[in-house]
């Protein structure tokens, strides 16, 4: 068995922790750092295959020294493009690299879409030609069993979901059914390349390079051991004390403090409670700077220009970085607008969360970063932020999508919002003149301001799309309908467009913003 003094950075061994059920478990963890406080060693551990927000300092009593794995000495590897080659490349990038090295030419798909493996009984149905309309006596029964969704490359000759083809609605067994027409009489390909998760981030399955602009941008570099470790112990913000999840580039001298004190109105940071109290006697703000563009009840939204209110915007980014791992901080906030959601009481407007967006986005992004502060999570505020971002897009007359990559919690929130919003549209369709109502993907996108790609990926994620006799059929089972109705009953916070006072600006005509 190894001794405590032999433990170094890079070692792996089981570490005792409590799980969600308050039970002891021994997951494998990596030692990222070692420090000595008053003669007692502390070890900063990252639990393998766990989110980094669970990383923590532990004592040697929680380490299983019998199963320690010492780091292997790595052979020196040549650098690629002038960058150190100590960290293995991501699988997505290694595949094309290996293919090029072998001299093979990779096929470039013209289009990528999602397909479903349908049961054989659905594919071969007696009676009727492919061009005939589907009737309620067809085989479109509610599909109660779980089927795996698959991604496949589609050649130009293979039909893909049409964005303008109308969707028909007809009832069966008390549940609504939608049928989206497409090119008839073509067979589907069956080769599978991945899962529907890929459709959220990019159309070709290969992550794009991060944009090096803006206040918070994609972070793909985790080589620096310093940025892999939480550096702030605790933050006091108003009546809340927050435990940061990730590294944030606050000044080095603040990282040794037991508590970092923030003014909840201007977000300036101080070393002590005395500093905060002195600041509060001088701070005139009782709400975020900028214009209040929405108020309903106790909820307000403030629009803040990253150029006009640079200090506040930078402090907001520093605070947000404590809870966002997939982004890295930049101090150029000029190209961004910040929308801060607050909750009002007799003391002022308290920050709940925020999202930022580019003043000019060539990729139709309506959100760059989005965050609900931990004390307000799981209360419906996340969806309210998302709904507000799309409400702004509606006023601007645009469709929008969040900047990728999304965090794990962000992806869950967006999928939930997209699903509820699209199902709300589909279930609200009414028939006219006795005919089945029809709708296209383009129309759904225009009504909701959700980008067409997100509409399609959501329908695929919900497993609503089936291909039958040359048509793409949207099938809403009773389980889907019941689940949606239950979810909407719990969603009490909604954006009221009548309470929004917002005039979009044409930033392209304003020079340097």
Curated annotation (Swiss-Prot):
UniProt effect for mutating residue 257 to A: Does not affect phosphorylation
A Pfam family assignment: MOZ_SAS
Listed result of changing residue 451 to R: Abrogates sumoylation
Disease: Neurodevelopmental disorder with dysmorphic facies, sleep disturbance, and brain abnormalities: A neurodevelopmental disorder characterized by severe global developmental delay, intellectual disability, poor or absent language, behavioral abnormalities, severe sleep disturbance, seizures, cerebral malformations, and craniofacial dysmorphism. Progressive cerebellar atrophy is also observed. Additional features may include genitourinary tract anomalies, hearing loss, and mild distal skeletal defects.
The encoding gene: KAT5
A cellular-component GO term for this protein: transcription regulator complex
Name of the protein described by the UniProt record: Histone acetyltransferase KAT5
Residues covered by the Tudor-knot domain: 8-65
Residues bound to acetyl-CoA: 370-372, 377-383, 407, 416
One function term, GO molecular function aspect: peptide butyryltransferase activity
Role, per record: Catalytic subunit of the NuA4 histone acetyltransferase complex, a multiprotein complex involved in transcriptional activation of select genes principally by acetylation of nucleosomal histones H2A and H4. Histone acetylation alters nucleosome-DNA interactions and promotes interaction of the modified histones with other proteins which positively regulate transcription. (Microbial infection) Catalyzes the acetylation of flavivirus NS3 protein to modulate their RNA-binding and -unwinding activities leading to facilitate viral replication.
Effect of residue 327 to Q: Mimics acetylation; promoting interaction with FOXP3 and subsequent acetylation
Database matches in InterPro entries: Acyl_CoA_acyltransferase, Chromo-like_dom_sf, Chromo/chromo_shadow_dom, HAT_MYST-type, MYST_HAT, Tudor-knot, WH-like_DNA-bd_sf, Zf-MYST
Post-translational modification: Phosphorylated on Ser-86 and Ser-90; enhanced during G2/M phase. The phosphorylated form has a higher activity. Phosphorylation at Ser-90 by CDK1 or CDK9 is a prerequisite for phosphorylation at Ser-86 by GSK3. Phosphorylation at Ser-86 by GSK3 (GSK3A or GSK3B) activates acetyltransferase and acyltransferase activities. Phosphorylation at Ser-90 by CDK9 promotes KAT5 recruitment to chromatin. Phosphorylation by VRK1 following DNA damage promotes KAT5 association with chromatin and histone acetyltransferase activity. Autoacetylated. Autoacetylation is required for histone acetyltransferase activity. Autoacetylation at Lys-327 is facilitated by interaction with EP300/p300: it prevents ubiquitination and subsequent degradation by the proteasome and promotes acetylation of target proteins. Deacetylated by HDAC3 and SIRT1. Deacetylation by HDAC3 promotes its ubiquitination and cytoplasmic localization.
Location of the region described as Disordered in the Swiss-Prot/TrEMBL record: 69-106, 122-220
Zinc finger (C2HC MYST-type) boundaries: 260-285
Result when mutating residue 380 to A: Loss of function. Does not affect phosphorylation
